Amino acid sequence: MATRVLHSSCSGLYRAAGPARGKGHATAVIRSLSASHNRPREDSWFKSLFVRKVDPRKDAHSHLLAKKEDNNLYKIQFHNVKPECLEAYNKLCEDVLTNIHTDKAYPCELVGTWNTWYGEQDQAVHLWRYRGGYPALTEVMSKLKNNKEFLEYRSERGKMLLSRRNQLLLEFSFWNEPVPRDGPNIYELRSYQLRPGTMIEWGNYWARAIGYRQHNREAVGGFFSQIGDLYMVHHLWAYKDLQSREDTRNAAWQHEGWDEVVYYTVPLIQHMESRIMIPLKNSPLK
């Protein structure tokens, strides 16, 4: 249809300019416009040769991206605290969460606990690890129902909170497992809401990219959601201070291949958020 329209339009030019000159001119116009019409498609096809493709899969991305040797499940909690209650809330968590963490009867560990410094204000973030996966989580939840100290904590906590939410996460196989580290450090939690169906592609690129971001031991952990907000990725980083963060992030651009990772992963993101967090006294990640 587009070619017929072009012929129709150009025939008018042909009649106006004369048979000899118009015919050649109309043909040139048709060829020029046809080439312009097809060029974006050709360019797109040409560029597609260099875009990393993800092979079709017949398995859940949780099986393809998570660590096979460990059966760890993570829970991240976001608690928005009444401003006037933040100090009391922190003290309450310092006592009770530490007791759960150190009690061998509970197959769980407190990976880290923080207050958000930049991002949502008056917010606490807790990251737990359950060694043994969902059965370990179920066991912990069952035992906590009979833990008097925890029940009192939960009652007091309810008076201090404005809202709360959580997610269950798995860790990417190409990230190191988060382990306690000495401080003082600040932590950045970068959260990405991906477009549905792009988690495998994200994992493919970041499996290569993580090598560019470990020179200052800044990489702490990488996770993707299983329950809660889906297609959500969390990357946790540690820095000495904000200037160290700036310098470390800028240095990544000096490594060949980092720019390509950014170029191809940005279109996979629907929304992203950065939190700068300060560890609490009882946090294993100092």
UniProtKB/Swiss-Prot annotation:
Belongs to the NipSnap family. Protein involved in mitophagy. Accumulates on the mitochondria surface in response to mitochondrial depolarization and acts as a 'eat me' signal by recruiting proteins involved in selective autophagy. Keywords: Autophagy, Mitochondrion, Transit peptide. InterPro entries: Dimeric_a/b-barrel, NIPSNAP, NipSnap_domain. It comes from the Eukaryota. GO terms for cellular component: cytoplasm; mitochondrial matrix; mitochondrion. GO terms for biological process: mitophagy. Gene3D superfamilies: 3.30.70.100. It is found in: Mitochondrion matrix. This is Protein NipSnap homolog 2. The keyword Membrane does not apply. It comes from Danio rerio. Residues 1-40 form a transit peptide. Pfam families: NIPSNAP (PF07978). One of its GO terms (molecular function) is protein-macromolecule adaptor activity. The keyword Transport does not apply.
